[in-house]
């Protein structure tokens, strides 16, 4: 005589409730590094384009690659892609204007 009785207690079951976000921000656990790298990439690519500094253009490409690699799936893909394309265009335009090799900033 084998009876199958459910051993769980119905009064002890608590349904999971997701924590509410505080205000506009996603909370303290949200990683802001992709956003910071995106902004840095845009700033350095503009410096590379306007001031014709090759090291700024390369650093912008580096920042936008980090931003692309660490972005979440829920992030706006257009913003990340536009930052990446802006940094690539900064590198290309800086070498089209002056095809000489890059000199380090401390050597000039």
Curated annotation (Swiss-Prot):
Start and end residues of each stretch annotated as Disordered: 1-29
Subcellular location: Membrane
Keyword Transmembrane: yes
Residue ranges the record marks as coiled coil: none
Any one GO MF annotation of this record: protein folding chaperone
Membrane topology field: Single-pass membrane protein
Protein name: Protein Asterix
Originating organism: Drosophila melanogaster (Fruit fly)
